[in-house]
Each structure stands twice: as C-alpha cells, then as structure tokens.
Amino acid sequence: MFGVRSATVRFGHTLALDDVTVEVPGGSVVAVVGGDGAGKSTLLRALAGEVPLDGGTIEAPPKQRLGYLPALAGSWAALTVKQNIDFVAGIYGLAGEELTARRAELLDRASLTPAAGRLAARLSGGMRRKLGFIMAIVHRPALLILDEPSTGVDPVSRIDLWRLVSEAAASGTAVLMSTTYLDEAERAAQLVVLDSGRILVQGSYDQVLAGFAGVVTQTDEPVRAEWAWRQGRVQHEYWPGAGPPPGITVVAPDLEDIVIALSLVRRNEVLS
C-alpha cells in the first residue's frame, strides 16, 4: 500500500496540502480531482519525491520502482519515439530482447507503432502524452503517478490512454492520477476531491454519490448566485440546508455537480 498520511506542504505562506491522507492500493486506480490550485499536482509530486513534506509521512517504492508522468512531461525532441523509450529503459537496466519485446508491446498498446521512427518534435499532443506514458511505465513500476495524462489530447488518444491506465492497474500496479475529466474519474476505484489543499470527500464513486447531502436544482435564474454554476445551457444551484422554494426543478447531481457544490461549501465556510 502506497500513499501519504497527514501530509502537509507549504510554499511560503501558502498551505498547498493540509493534513491530506490518501492510500493507493496495488492493482487499483485512485483519481484526484479538483479545481485549479486545489493541490492535485502538489500531492502527486510529493508522492513522487519531487516536493518535500512539511509534515506527515510518505509510503512509496524506491525510485527504480516508481513511474511518474508530470503535467508537462517532456520527451527529447531530437530523438525518435523508439530512441526516447530506449533511453529511459536503459536507465532502468532494460536491454536486449527484453527491451525489444517490452517496447513493441507498449507501442502496440498505445497505437504508436507506425510512429516509432518519427522524431518526438513531430508528434501531435496526444501522441506525445502517450509516449510520455510509455516512458513512465516501460520498467513495470510498482507505483505509477500520472498528472493529468489526458488533458488537451484528442478523444481517440484519451481512449488509448485510459486503456493503458486500466491495463497497468490490472497488472498489479498502483495508479494515482489527477484528471480534469470527471468521466475518467468515475471509472477509478477511488476518488479524492481536493479544494485549496484539503480533502473534501473521498471514496468510491458510489460512496461519494450516496454521501452527498443537500439538493441540486436546475433553473434559468438562480435564487442565490453565490451557490449557482452553469451546466450546459442551464444553471444548477445547490441547497445545502433548507430545500429550494416550491416550483424549482430538482435534478439528480452528477460528479461535476458534487465537486462544485462541495467546493462552494468550503469557500463559503472560509468567507464566513
């Protein structure tokens, strides 16, 4: 079991993580969601050993057994896809027939075999993210940390990336990933919702839905603008305590509604 316990991280006067505990079991995917500045990247970087804790503990494998794909993962632009993979694989001692087989397997899984000889500089954004994923997992890590692996990529590449994530977990790897796509988060075994460095809720998708209190309504004109947000062409409004006035349509909240509503509760608590 990998993860962080009571993790606290400060950047100057800013509390980036505030007493955060997250467990990442082997063979499962834990998805971290939240708005900008929620602490998602800080949590992942802390577990990857890139950011020191000011308090709490980390349980992580040695560097040789850890795979990490940062939000701005870089490949070597002047190297081909194959050369990028081989360079990273060599750091972990993969060579010869073992490397050849592993490279071919991952290129096929990522639909990158036709691009194996292409310079990384000439790849699309989605192809670069898939290459970064391969470089993070080529050595079969025990813990795989992915910072928004599918942000900004095309729909087909998103499908490829999620398949790769699922296959990694199925092989026994513990996967911790942040994502801006809540449909991806819903597929994870566990969700962690962060806001301003604090956990608002965590658990399985079903547990998060079942534990959500209050009512969400749909309206063209919200009664209280500070509790409302746009959802497509309409607005949703959260009623954490007393129910809405008569005549307002109540809707079943989805994960996006829950994340926004909990964030609004947190921010109104801070302001009060």
Q: Which residues does each PLM region occupy?
A:
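Conserved structural motif at the start of ABC-family nucleotide-binding domains
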Residues: 2-4, 17
